[in-house]
Amino acid sequence: MPSDQFIDYLKYVENGSKIGWDEDQQLWFPHASPEGGNDTIAYGHKLRDAEVEQANKGLTDDEVEELLIEDLEYATDGAKAILSTHFNEDFNSLSENSQEMLIDFAYNLGSYGLKSFPKFVGAVCNNDIDTMCAEYKRYYTDGFGAKKELKQRNEEFYRLFLA
């Protein structure tokens, strides 16, 4: 299970401004996903078709915590699989810090997203801090096709894992 510090980090970088939180009702409501498709709720949970109706009624903090834990387990399993099949590395042999770095990438990008960062993944597996620092930054393409840095997430990632 990831550390509390990592879970707090993930909550902050996924939705630190608490988009979709209704203070009066003490419920979370869906909001549009930047990548399109089904809406997202709380901490980056992409709603499945079967979840939409219930989510539109609002979810409690406990319910979104459960979704976060499920999504973290899914990201962890995905990171383990990609590390084994594409990098010939054993996830369980890595330090907790290294595991959490890879889980963060899998949570944010999907487990296959790790394949897009082979130098970073290799550096994590070899505890090569210099290469990690050179390769950790993530970007997105805006609606006009321009590549933009995920600045806040990158800064928080550096602060937690690499500083």
Where are these regions (language model features)?
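Alpha-helical segment that forms one wall of the substrate-binding/catalytic cleft
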Residues: 54-87, 96-101, 108-114
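A contiguous strand-loop segment
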Residues: 12, 16-19, 23, 69-70, ...
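Surface-exposed patches in mature extracellular/periplasmic domains of secreted proteins
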Residues: 19-25, 81-95, 119, 135
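Amphipathic alpha-helical segments that form the core helices of the histone-fold
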Residues: 35, 41, 99-106, 122-125
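Short, functionally critical alpha-helical segments immediately adjacent to catalytic or ligand/cofactor-binding
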Residues: 5-18, 101-105
